[in-house]
Amino acid sequence: MSQPPKILLLYAHPEPQDSVANRVLLQPAQQLANVTVHDLYAHYPDFFIDIHHEQQLLREHQIIVFQHPFYTYSCPALLKEWLDRVLSRGFANGIGGNALAGKYWRSVITTGEPEDAYHADGNNRYPMDDLLRPFELTAAMCRMHWMRPMIVYWARRLQPDVLSSQARAYGEWLSSPLPEEER
């Protein structure tokens, strides 16, 4: 049996102390040897990102997980800055920019609204797949494989047993994220 692939979990929450759901989701990840949890707000409170360090982390991992709350149909500001600065031309895209080609991208997102708010007749007027399209396109621009996102809807209002169940499922996926033939 082969080793599980190395996973870089980029965690971006500007107020982690207030996030019950993300704290619970991170617990299984922090126990796994194949997962590097990288808290962007803890590392870069001033938003001055060490681009070379971040690019080296990306080179060292096969799967990149972006875990964050869904803010204004996107991600928190520091993660957006990270995407714009770290996934640069010549590294992740453009001529010679193939450092991430063939790697995997998975978004793990918590929302403040129920799942039925994300459809044509819902509060947000679009399904979540449509709202996540910019992330999917960014993965494609970097020649990465887009993996089905994990969405935790109405995160603050979930019953503890439901949230624990989702965290267990997340931990199981992190333990074995790819079929054997893709490792």
Curated annotation (Swiss-Prot):
Catalytic activity: a quinone + NADH + H(+) = a quinol + NAD(+); a quinone + NADPH + H(+) = a quinol + NADP(+)
UniProt GO MF annotations: electron transfer activity; FMN binding; NADH:ubiquinone reductase (non-electrogenic) activity; NADPH dehydrogenase (quinone) activity
Pfam families referenced in this protein's UniProt entry, alphabetically: Flavodoxin_2
EC number per UniProt: 1.6.5.2
GO BP, sorted A to Z: positive regulation of potassium ion transmembrane transport; potassium ion transport
GO cellular component entries: plasma membrane
Key words, A-Z: Cell inner membrane, Cell membrane, Membrane, NAD, Oxidoreductase
Main location: membrane
SUPFAM superfamilies, per database record: Flavoproteins (SSF52218)
Subcellular location(s) of the protein: Cell inner membrane
Mode of membrane association: Peripheral membrane protein
InterPro entries linked: Flavodoxin_fold, Flavoprotein-like_sf, K_H_efflux_KefG, KefG/KefF
Enzyme class: oxidoreductase
Annotated coiled-coil segments of the chain: none
Record has Nucleotide-binding as a keyword: no
Keyword Cell inner membrane: yes
Family stated for the protein in its record: Belongs to the NAD(P)H dehydrogenase (quinone) family. KefG subfamily.
Function: Regulatory subunit of a potassium efflux system that confers protection against electrophiles. Required for full activity of KefB.
Subunit structure: Interacts with KefB.
Protein name, per record: Glutathione-regulated potassium-efflux system ancillary protein KefG
Organism: Pectobacterium atrosepticum (strain SCRI 1043 / ATCC BAA-672) (Erwinia carotovora subsp. atroseptica)
Lineage start: Bacteria, Pseudomonadati, Pseudomonadota, Gammaproteobacteria, Enterobacterales
